[in-house]
From Swiss-Prot:
It catalyses: a 3-demethylubiquinol + S-adenosyl-L-methionine = a ubiquinol + S-adenosyl-L-homocysteine + H(+); a 3-(all-trans-polyprenyl)benzene-1,2-diol + S-adenosyl-L-methionine = a 2-methoxy-6-(all-trans-polyprenyl)phenol + S-adenosyl-L-homocysteine + H(+). Pathway: Cofactor biosynthesis; ubiquinone biosynthesis. NCBIfam families: UbiG. InterPro entries: SAM-dependent_MTases_sf, UbiG_MeTrfase. PANTHER family: METHYLTRANSFERASE, UBIQUINONE BIOSYNTHESIS O-METHYLTRANSFERASE, MITOCHONDRIAL. This is Ubiquinone biosynthesis O-methyltransferase. One of its GO terms (biological process) is methylation. O-methyltransferase that catalyzes the 2 O-methylation steps in the ubiquinone biosynthetic pathway. It holds the Pfam family Methyltransf_23. It comes from Pseudoalteromonas translucida (strain TAC 125). Gene3D superfamilies: Vaccinia Virus protein VP39 (3.40.50.150). S-adenosyl-L-methionine binds at residues 39, 59, 80, 124. The gene is ubiG.
């Protein structure tokens, strides 16, 4: 599969259709806004701080994480294949004065053009939306410098993840639009780690992300059965 084929146009269309509401704190992307501080803290902690680090956000969408990392002093580039989310991200960057470079380009192509460039690479909630997640993981590894910090987050392929992310979040609680996720595309941590190790990455830490529907609060913990985040180091 070439890099230009590793795009699910139906997935892109889902996010294009609602891109204008990316920064609406009570809209379809409310869960992303709510988990962002937890993701950001995890990344900042594992990297020892982001200040002045060349940082790439793969699958950046409307720029929620990208802009948060830039506010911490990182030199951030965000790449995505959705034009509307990138347009929203650029406008929000102009409105807030937070400097992020946004580019529409496949990760594989960008990796061939910028190998071993970045100190930090993030790829959050993207792998479950592409036809070939292993290809993205290899591109991310290629983009990272030796010793760089690399982060992936996605959904575990478990019955609990189906129950919580699709039945609960989509159908019952209406937290995200119905059809956002496909359980067949969820990825077990062992599979993600295997792909990452093949690409020259070494796992360093993991965390689970849980939602309490009673308190309506998210938390990081050791339960990786639904949402999880993995931290890797690029080997020399």
């Amino acid at each position: 599969m070439t890099e230009h084929q590793n795009v699910d146009h139906a997935e892109i269309a889902k996010f294009e259709a609602i891109a204008e509401r990316w920064w609406d704190l009570d809209g379809e992307f409310k869960p992303l806004h709510e988990i962002n501080p937890l993701r950001l803290d995890f990344i900042a902690n594992k990297t020892g701080g982001l200040f002045d680090k060349e940082t790439l956000d793969v699958g950046c969408g409307g720029g929620i994480l990208s802009q948060s990392m830039a506010r911490m002093g990182a030199k951030v580039t965000g790449i995505d294949m959705g034009q509307e989310p990138l347009t929203v991200a650029k406008l929000h960057s102009l409105e807030t004065g937070v400097n992020v470079e946004y580019i529409k380009v496949p990760a594989e192509q960008y990796a061939s053009e910028h190998p071993a460039r970045f100190d930090v690479v993030t790829c959050m909630e993207m792998l479950e939306h592409v036809p070939d997640p292993a290809s993205i993981i290899h591109a991310v590894a290629e983009l990272a410098k030796p010793g760089a910090d690399v982060f992936f987050s996605t959904l575990n392929k478990t019955p609990k993840a189906y129950l919580y992310a699709i039945i609960g979040a989509e159908k019952l609680l209406k937290m995200v639009p119905e059809g956002t996720h496909d359980h067949k595309k969820f990825i077990k941590p062992a599979q993600l780690i295997a792909w990452a190790e093949q690409a020259g990455l070494k796992v360093r830490a993991s965390a689970g992300l849980s939602y309490n529907p009673l308190s309506k609060q998210y938390s990081l913990n050791t339960d990786v059965s639904v949402n999880y985040i993995l931290h890797f180091e690029k080997l020399a």
